[in-house]
Amino acid sequence: MAVAFPYTPFPFNVTAISPSFRLSPVSVATNVSLGWAPSCATPECLPTASWSTSAINSTLSFKYWGWDVALDGNVKGNMSVDLFNEEGRIIWNPSGDKLFSLRGGPDDHLQRNITLRVLDASPGSQLTVTRARVNGSSRGDYTWPADRWIVPSDNDRLSYSGFIPQTSVAQAGSPTTYSSSTAGDSVSMQFNGSAFLIYGPCGPTNGLMRVTVDGNQQTVNTSKPFASDDCLLFQSPGQNIHNLHQLVVENVDGRTLGIDRFEFFRIQLYQRSGSANGKRVAVILCTIVGAIVLCSVVIVIYVRRSVKRKMNPEADRPRAGHRGFMWLHL
C-alpha cells in the first residue's frame, strides 16, 4: 500500500487462519451457507486459504498494530455489509479484488480493530476474504531505511525451557519447530528492533500463548477450528530501537504451543532514504567534524602560547617608552 504521509511501516500480509482474525460462525463442514468456510481444509493448504460465507449475521474481526490496513477479497451477488472500527462506521465500497482499505492517523501506537458483519444476502451471494495487508507499527514517523530479517526457532540466540525440537512441516524460513505441551514452558531472547512477528502452527489443540516484552504482557489464543501448519501467531506493537529488549514467550495453559520462527524489523534512524536526505546528512556530518577540528586547533594554539609564557615571562612585558601594546598608541 502507498502511504498517505511520511512514515516507515512494517508491511506484512496475513490470512484469516491467524489468531489475529476472529470469524463467527465457522462452518466445520466447510458449507458457506452455514458460516465462514475455508477454500481448503488441509494443514498444508490452510496458511494461504481464502474464507467465504453466504450466511446472514456472519462476522469477521481483525486486530492489528499500525497505520493502514486493506482487506482483499470479493463479493458475488448482492450483500449488505456493515463495516466499522473503534472510531465508528466505515464506508463499504468493494471494488474488484479489494473489499476496503483504510488510512490510519499520524501515529501507530494503538491497537486497531476492524469488524464487518453481513446484514443481508440475496440467494447465491457470497463474501470471500483472501488476506489482510497491513502497514504495521514501527515507530518510524519519517521515511527511513529499514532492515528485515528472520530468526528461525533453532537459532542460538533463543533460550528454551521445556520446548522440544521437531522438524518443521511448513519449512517457511525455519527447518525446525519447537513445541510445548506444558504450562510454564518458555522461550526467551534479547533483540534490538522496531517490531516483530511470531509464526507457528495453530489449530484445535493449541491454547494460550503469553508474549512479554520488557515486562509488558499480551496473551493470545492460538486455538483455531482447523489445523494449519503455519500461522501468524503474534504481531508486536512498535518498539523503541534505542533499547535492548527482553522477549519471553510462554505456554499459559498446557495446551500445544509451537514456535517456528520470528521475523524482525528495524528502522535506521540516522540514515534517511533518498539522495537529498543523504546529502543533507553528509553536510551536517562535515560541519560537525569541521567544528571539532577547529576547536582542537584553537586549544593547541592556546596551550602552546601558555607554555611559552611560563617559560619566558619577560616576553609579555611592555618595553620602556611604550604604553601598553604597540597598536594602542593614542
Where are these regions (language model features)?
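Glycan-recognition surfaces in beta-rich domains, encompassing non-catalytic CBMs
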Residues: M1-A282, G290-I299, P313-E314
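Intrinsically disordered, low-complexity terminal tails of fungal membrane proteins
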Residues: I301-L330
